[in-house]
Amino acid sequence: MTSAGNPAVDPAARPFQGGRRLPLTWLGVTPFFVYVGLFLLLPTVVIVAGSITAGDGSLTLANLTNIQQAYLVKAFLNSFIVSLVSALIGAIGGALLAYAVATGNPRGALRRTVTSASGVLAQFGGVTLTFAFIATLGTIGFVTLFLKDRGLDVFANGVWLYELSGLILIYTYFQIPLMVLVFLPALDGIRPQWREATESLGGSTWHYWRYVAGPLLAPAFLGCTLLLFANAFSAYATAAALISQGGIIVPLQISNLFTSETGRAQPGLAKALALAMIVVVAIVMLLYALLQRRTSRWLR
C-alpha cells in the first residue's frame, strides 16, 4: 500500500539517479528522426562533401563553378519553366476543383470521389504515368491515331510530347490533384458567417472576395503553389521514363553525369548540381512554411 506521505510514482516518470527523468515520450518519434537522418540528412552531407571534392580526394570549388556552363544553365532554366508553368496550371485548376468540392455537400459523393481520386492521382507518376500518356498521346497512341484518321495531326509541328511542353502536360496530371489535397483545408476554414456578415453590411460578392476571402486565402494559395513548384522541380522518374536521351532538365543532367556511357562521368559536378537543387527547394519550402504559418492563424 502507498501511504499518504509517499504517493505512487508512475514508472514511466521515475527519475534517474541524479534527478533526470526517463524521456519515454521521445521513443515514439525516434523512428522518424532515424528515417530523416538516414534518407535526408546523410545524403545531404554526402552531396555537400562530394560537390567540394576532386577526383583525387582534394578540396576544390571547381565543381561549383562548373555548374555555370551554358548547357547546365539551360537545364536549370528549363526546370524552372516546367516547374513554374505546371505549378501555375495545377494551382489554378486544383483551386477551382477544390472550391467546387468545398462549396458542395461535405458528406456528398462529389467530395468523397474527388478527395479519394486526388489522393491516388497525386502519387501516380513515374514509369506508369509516362506509359499511360505514351499509349494515349504518343506517336502511335490511340487518341493520336483516332484524331489522325479524322484529319487532325497533333504532331504536325513536331513530336512535342517528348519535349518541355510534354513534360508540362504530364506534370500537370499530378499537380492538380495535389493542389486539391493541400488547398482544400484552407477553403474549409472559410466560414459561411463571413459571407453573411458581408452581405448584411451591404457588400457584394466582389467585396467579399476582395476584402474577406481573398486576403485570407492568398497566403494559402501562394504557399500551395510553391509546394507544387518544388514537387515538379525535384521530379525525376517521370521525365527519365519519357526522355531516355539528353538532359533537358536538371534531374536528367545529374543522372547523365553519374552514368555517362562514354566513360566521362563527373560525379563531383553531378553532386554540385544536386546541391544547387537542394538550395532552391530549401528556399521554396522555407517560403511555403512561412506562408502556412500565416494561414494557420485563422484556421485554428
Per-region residue spans from a language model:
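Membrane-cytosol interface at the C-terminal ends of specific transmembrane alpha-helices
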Residues: 155-199, 225
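Interhelical loop and adjacent transmembrane-helix boundary motif
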Residues: 14, 19-22, 64-71, 240-290, ...
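Short membrane-interfacial helix/loop motifs at transmembrane-helix boundaries
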Residues: 6, 33-73, 141, 148, ...
